[in-house]
Amino acid sequence: MGARASVLTGGKLDRWEKIYLRPGGKKKYMMKHLVWASRELERFACNPSLMETTEGCKQLLQQLEPALKTGSEGLRSLFNTIVVLWCVHQGIPVKDTKEALDQLQEAQQKGKQEVAAATADGTSTVSRNFPIVANAQGQMVHQPISPRTLNAWVKVVEEKAFSPEVIPMFMALSEGATPQDLNTMLNTVGGHQAAMQMLKEVINEEAAEWDRLHPVHAGPVPPGQMREPRGSDIAGTTSTIQEQVGWMTSNPPIPVGDIYKRWIILGLNKIVKMYCPVSILDIKQGPKESFRDYVDRFYKTLRAEQATQEVKNWMTDTLLVQNANPDCKSILRALGPGATLEGDEPAFQGVGGPSHKARVLAEAMSQAQHSNDAKRQFKGPKRIVKCFNCGKEGHIARNCKAPRRKGCWKCGQEGHQMRNCTNERQANFFRETLAFQQGKAREFPSEETRTNSSTNRELRVQGGGTCPEGGSEERGDREQAVSSANFPQISLWQRPVVTVRIEGQLKEALLDTGADDTVLEEIELGGRWKPKMIGGIGGFIKVRQYDNVTIDICGKRAVGTVLVGPTPVNIIGRNILTQIGCTLNFPISPIETVPVSLKPGMDGPRVKQWPLTEEKIRALTEICTEMEKEGKISRVGPENPYNTPIFAIKKKDSTKWRKLVDFRELNKRTQDFWEVQLGIPHPAGLKQKKSVTVLDVGDAYFSCPLDENFRKYTAFTIPSVNNETPGIRYQYNVLPQGWKGSPAIFQSSMTKILEPFRKQNPEIIIYQYMDDLYVGSDLKIELHREKVEELRAHLLKWGFTTPDKKHQKEPPFLWMGYELHPDKWTVQPIQLPEKESWTVNDIQKLIGKLNWACQIYPGIRVKQLCKLIRGTKALTEVVTFTTEAELELAENREILKEPVHGAYYDPSKELIAEIQKQGQGQWTYQIFQEQYKNLKTGKYARMRSAHTNDVKQLTEVVQKVALESIVIWGKVPRFRLPIQKETWEAWWTDYWQATWIPEWEYVNTPPLVKLWYQLEQDPIPGAETFYVDGAANRETKLGKAGYVTDKGRQKIISLTETTNQKAELQAIQLALQDSEVEVNIVTDSQYALGIIQGQPDTSESEIVNQIIEELIKKEKVYLSWVPAHKGIGGNEQIDKLVSSGIRKVLFLDGIDKAQEEHEKYHNNWRAMASDFNLPPIVAKEIVANCDKCQLKGEAIHGQVDCSPGIWQLDCTHLEGKIILVAVHVASGYMEAEVIPAETGQETAYFILKLAGRWPVKVIHTDNGSNFTSSTVKAACWWAGIQQEFGIPYNPQSQGVVESMNKELKKIIGQIRDQAEHLKTAVQMAVFIHNFKRKGGIGGYSAGERIIDILATDIQTTKLQQQISNIQKFRVYYRDSRDPIWKGPAKLLWKGEGAVVLQDQEEIKVVPRRKAKIIRDYGKQMAGDDCVASRQDENQNME
């Protein structure tokens, strides 16, 4: 038996004996089970010695498992025993046999997956997510990306918002993807425009770098050989999926997918850095921050760092220790380099917490060593000292770390000290009467006498009952849900010390909600223990850890870990308190107020109260008196200078009055709020529930307190009739109706209040929008209503009432404008009014009702009704209905006659969306899960551009429906679209980057969407070629349009009231009209080309509609563009024909000079057009022919804060060197310099040089260490410069200088070969940017613009001073022949012969001789010797 029992030894045997035979059972595995198993194995002809190793157990399990299906219960027991034994050998922690079986099953599945993966790797080298597989003919073909993968990617981006986790998720989801797959993934998240723009820029830069490093080989590509991919091919914009597959599967392969993915990851890293701008160097542990929280922050930031894994490993090894607080740093160093965060985390327990200021481990160890040395050196008899305070040996009361006990240390009575004590009795400081006498909760003062202050805290143990001595059993769930008044309560005016029973032993212990663990002084507990060191009040102490110890506290039993050691006081920690439901309570817990402030630099409203009728004053006085009694408002005195006007209106269908406050002025001055809820919940998103209740919160806003510091700004006044008495002034104590902050603060407060109820009742669904609550569950109706009453009681505890009047218990439920039934929903009944005459206001209301109805009534249209009220019309203006609008309204009335209902959402079924074309640019859609049971319907009639087609509009409808579905149901439906695959593919080929739509299928629902015509990609051989052109004179509006053909035909027509763009289109229409069914057309108008290449089938332009009609008649049309004035035969000929008498003569002798200057400076087209008097098209063509200027398009210039004194500074890197760039925000003027190091000293020197050249008021920088240094701050202080720091990812923040960094690098790249050193190239690039590039505001160069801005600023300031001086004077004047002097009037301007003045609202010019100018002395009366006409008129007014 000894040999068989030796299967497990040491710690493994201890773990074996802790595992239960059954879940929830009492029996555990013992030694005898091992002996029995070995005998049974011999009976089954198996080797028992295999039980001694993990591998042996695995072999036994493989042998026994096939026989389980037909085996006996004994065989199953043997198998279970071997499974548990295998877990013990493996070191897998399990509590019982069932957990062991689960662990085995997991291990087996994992093994199968690894085998399958190894097999797949051995047979195929292509991706498993996006496989490129061989078809039946042996060709490699691509399987497209699945909607599930796309949905997962969209969900990641929406939930993680470009946090560091996005990058590994993208890498996983895009494993083996082609560039086309990657572009599809990017298009699905195209709504994040700013992030996608950054990504696009990185991809463009990488593509340009690829082209530079992989130049195209001269000559044609040999037959049978694939061309080499360019940067744009890798990005998927100029390559087909067949080419991408070919490159990826060629020999040797070119992994274009992996290359493109690497570029995207570079861009994602940049985006992540913007979203997570904190540097790893800034992550430092706070003095009171726990080590775990610090490590979490450290690794989260580390994931966002753009560095190699080696660098990140170095950061972990050095920075993690370096930036820890002193306590944790010393512990980390003491633990040594071999320590692991998981294994040594207990060493940091209590370190850095707010209630435990621990000493460092090294110090504790050294103290222990010193004490041992001292003991060895101690000689003579040992004197035992005993503490009077805690009664323990080893220290005296003066050095006692336990809290001081009240009263005499000898007898325990108060009123005297121990030295004056006459009693012989020893005090019992741990007597049971301290907190609970004979097991009962001590009595407390009544609610009336108890203070309402936040210091009146109580510990409450959930569940009634007596203390352990009473021996009461646990009660049922229903008995536990008693009112809080029956819970044992322990006041925190004194220390909460109670008697607890630990494994049958009584102990006094302190209930400590701030302690993690339960720590007791010396107590004998049976069983095994393990050593541990913890941080306590007096430093580190060594303790013994006992697991699964039973503790009884106040009739509640808990089983947990107990630490035993030399603690100054017994502590029951959170590991036990949470099990018994002990909570820290505040008897009266007011809703926490949200701090509110005014906008910076603004003061409260000071609007006078307007007069009110006696009836309204009486009503307001009555309302305010009642509100004052309820505490909603309180009176204020004259010290409050603010006021907001109030008035009263009668309620609908009632004689009662309603108080209204005009908070418009306060709303302008109050800070902005973020709406917590961005939309209203929709019934189509509700899951069908067996039991439903709808509640309404009464006086919602008046239940939430307003920030005390903000209340003074809500003051208002009730006046008295005829000013009989001073007005009564009040201010709000709660959220006022009509104030802009009330909705957001109420929603936030309501969410916090409902959160605990939601956690305690996960089976209850609560939809909350403002004061409307929808409560649904699958409980029986009686139990559901009990839960609703609990919710109402919970809300009432926080001061929110739910009136019975609006408590809906039976269907149909009226909620949010909808009508809810148990199995369906609809909108509340809609009645369309019948009117003889309709005003603009009536039609607006009518359209609103129809728009509301269209979410469930399919087919509703409002386009013709909307046309009736286009333009700026008065609300009361009568509108005449058109025939189309009358017909549309009649159709809508018919639709609304039959009631329509919507279904509820079933998560187990698929979402389907079907779209129909209604004609006239209107579309309808239905979203359903079962046919004819719509969840929701809707319409779409928006034209995003003047010229569009049905395919483009269809994609817009799909995107609207997809977005709506994600909002309501959290996923994208499968679409059924009225368009054939061939039609879609024909349009998608050219416009795949324009938009994204998910998986869809064709449904034959007339009218089908089709492309009415298609333009050819190459010239049509044999077809006549028309060179077309049009021209117009801007002044006379006269023009010509015409064509010439390659066969000698020509035609010119004259036009009136036209423009250049119209004339160009007219010429194309003329060519289409006079040509055969196949035609080639050549134009020099980019405008016309852009419209027609979009293949529109409808347009707001009459001429474009005519062109569309002509295009539909043609079989083949090829349309091409050539630049004007370039000597192209037919183009030049027609240009001369249409220009005669129309266009002004153009002198183009400056082209050569412009080309020469561009080769030197690479200036932009605007600068050349301005400097050399060239047409824009010619200047653009010069830029287009320059290979160095075709890397990227020009940046789109926006506008930020354009104050003249604001500069943005940033450091950028090029060729391994640092360039410090400063940009004048208003003008775009740039100063840049190569600096030797990115230090505060160099930055401060640069700022002082900049301030010496230009007036710098504000500099805006990022949070780099050089900009935040004290040297830079000192330089800014000396130069009087205000320094601001950027907000990450804010376009108003660092956008200008970031854009200029790219522009500077672009210019440097164009002229780099002209300079030997980078610092020279930088200064040359700055010169080119400032003086050789024109555009933007005013068409100036940046250098001209900054001078113009500064000069204008000086002139404006001077003019304001002059105006200010002039306004100090008043004018008396005589008008025509009237001898009476008039005045005083305001002086506006003083000239040599006349003055301009303003008398009341009239402005007059008066001759100088008829005017007398005097200084304005205010209301001071002039004396007898002060005559206005004697004032000196020649005072300096400049």
UniProtKB/Swiss-Prot annotation:
A zinc finger (Integrase-type) spans 1149-1190. Its cofactor is Mg(2+). A zinc finger (CCHC-type) spans 385-402, 406-423. It catalyses: Specific for a P1 residue that is hydrophobic, and P1' variable, but often Pro; Endohydrolysis of RNA in RNA/DNA hybrids. Three different cleavage modes: 1. sequence-specific internal cleavage of RNA. Human immunodeficiency virus type 1 and Moloney murine leukemia virus enzymes prefer to cleave the RNA strand one nucleotide away from the RNA-DNA junction. 2. RNA 5'-end directed cleavage 13-19 nucleotides from the RNA end. 3. DNA 3'-end directed cleavage 15-20 nucleotides away from the primer terminus; 3'-end directed exonucleolytic cleavage of viral RNA-DNA hybrid; DNA(n) + a 2'-deoxyribonucleoside 5'-triphosphate = DNA(n+1) + diphosphate. Residues 440-450 have a biased composition (Basic and acidic residues). Residues 1020-1143 form the RNase H type-1 domain. Gene3D superfamilies: 1.10.10.200, 1.10.1200.30, 3.30.70.270, Acid Proteases, HIV Type 1 Reverse Transcriptase, subunit A, domain 1, Human Immunodeficiency Virus Type 1 Capsid Protein, Immunodeficiency lentiviruses, gag gene matrix protein p17, Integrase, C-terminal domain superfamily, retroviral. A motif (Tryptophan repeat motif) lies at residues 984-1000. Gag-Pol polyprotein and Gag polyprotein may regulate their own translation, by the binding genomic RNA in the 5'-UTR. At low concentration, Gag-Pol and Gag would promote translation, whereas at high concentration, the polyproteins encapsidate genomic RNA and then shut off translation. This is Gag-Pol polyprotein. It comes from Simian immunodeficiency virus (isolate MB66).
